[in-house]
Design a protein with these regions (language model features):
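N-terminal, charge-rich interaction modules
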Residues: 1-62, 66-69, 75, 176, ...
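Internal, well-folded beta-alpha domain core
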Residues: 60-61, 67-190
Length: 190
């Protein structure tokens, strides 16, 4: 088969990116950077877990969401809605009085497949409240952060469940801000 005539090259153009694709790519970049630099706060193009969902979820994902609106949006992507203990992507509504016992059923992977640990997304206030000291990959020495709006004992339970390489990755959304805490991050409650 011969080469295309030189004049036909001008007919081939790249598709234009739509507003949704631009938003989802910007959100993906923000959450990627947030997870690679634990404790850093990144800006999302639009507020809330909805933006994170649209950047991460597709039809190959198993999703659990406490909020029916988020669950409906996940279903629209073609993702499979799953119970908490089977979901790879978990969108939780955790208010300060919530019972954390159910979090013990989150997928944390196995020695053979640690990558099967869940990705958890929740909302809380960043920059105020309970002080935490972070250490581990992506942090030069240590880093102190503050988070409020999560149940008492949440980070203690998270530490029990996250024994690297096992565990779950956590995104905390606060309006249009997001912070990532990967399973490899050690969290000391101050």
């Amino acid at each position: 088969m011969g080469a295309l005539p030189a004049s036909s090259h001008a007919l081939i153009t790249a598709p234009l990116r739509g507003e949704d694709e631009i938003r989802d790519n910007a959100a993906f970049e923000a959450i990627l950077w947030a997870l690679s630099r634990p404790g850093d706060v990144r800006n999302l193009p639009k507020p809330g877990p909805r933006t994170i969902l649209l950047a991460l979820i597709d039809r190959e994902c198993r999703v659990h969401a406490d909020d029916p609106v988020i669950a409906g949006l996940a279903a629209q992507t073609g993702a499979t809605l799953a119970p908490l203990h089977e979901a790879c992507h978990v969108f939780l509504q955790l208010d300060p009085g919530a019972d954390t016992a159910r979090l013990a059923t989150l997928k944390t992977g196995s020695a053979l497949y640690p990558d099967e640990g869940a990705t958890v997304v929740t909302e809380a206030r960043l920059g105020e409240g309970q002080r935490l000291r972070l250490s581990g990959p992506g942090i030069e020495t240590t880093r102190e952060i503050a988070v409020t709006g999560l149940p008492q004992g949440f980070f203690a339970l998270r530490n029990d469940l996250c024994r690297y390489p096992l565990g779950f990755d956590l995104f905390i959304a606060d309006g249009s801000k997001v912070m990532g805490l990967p399973r490899s991050t050690r969290i000391e409650v101050l």
